[in-house]
A protein has these predicted regions:
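Ser/Thr-rich low-complexity repeats and stalk/linker segments
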Residues: 1-188
Length: 188
């Protein structure tokens, strides 16, 4: 063997694209996002948040990684890629859009008004109308209706004779909640 002309086999093969154990949530109230996944053993995983490197995780010999990221308020774009010991970079994962929203949704009850008195049997079924966050889930005494893309919601409700307590809960995509309660009286 001619030692002067020895060739070294340089690793030019990029690592496999890292794989997340589960798809990140689309919306969260928390600014903290915990990620777990799999990548080439003893490599590094680079986390890009809004196209900027935000963290780096070491991959174990078993090929696993975990990382906690801090999200910005509003929309966040997340992508990750791997770097092996030779410095080869994998392709990036697809981009994940994650909305961080810590604000409770608005909840306005337009009709009926709190304290309203409804009379006559023909008026026993009332129309409840209100406004909340776009696409929020609205629960009225445990029964769900959805707000439309502009936040409007409307549903019919059957009143019992006497005082009726109506409990409203609005829940947005990030699971923030707003609660309200009104009382409506029904007389035959």
């Amino acid at each position: 063997i001619d030692k002067d002309n020895a060739t070294t086999d340089k690793d030019n093969v990029p690592p496999q694209v890292p794989v997340l154990a589960s798809t990140p949530v689309e919306a969260t109230f928390s600014a903290s996002l915990n990620l777990q996944g799999f990548a080439e053993p003893k490599s590094k995983v680079i986390f890009l948040l809004n196209s900027v490197k935000s963290a780096e995780a070491e991959v174990t010999e078993a090929g696993q990684f975990t990382q906690e990221l801090t999200l910005n308020e509003g929309l966040n774009e997340l992508a990750i890629y791997g770097v092996d010991a030779a410095g080869n970079e994998s392709l990036k994962t697809r981009s994940y859009l994650i909305s961080q929203d810590a604000e409770a949704p608005i909840l306005e009850i337009k009709t009926p008004k709190d304290g309203a008195v409804i009379e006559l049997k023909k008026n026993r079924t009332i129309k409840i109308e209100g406004q909340s966050e776009a696409n929020a889930k609205i629960f009225i005494n445990g029964r769900m209706t959805l707000a439309d893309s502009e936040g409007n919601f409307s549903t019919d409700f059957y009143l019992n004779e006497g005082k009726n307590t109506l409990e409203f809960i609005a829940i947005d995509k990030a699971t923030n909640k707003t609660q309200k309660q009104i009382e409506v009286e029904f007389k035959l």
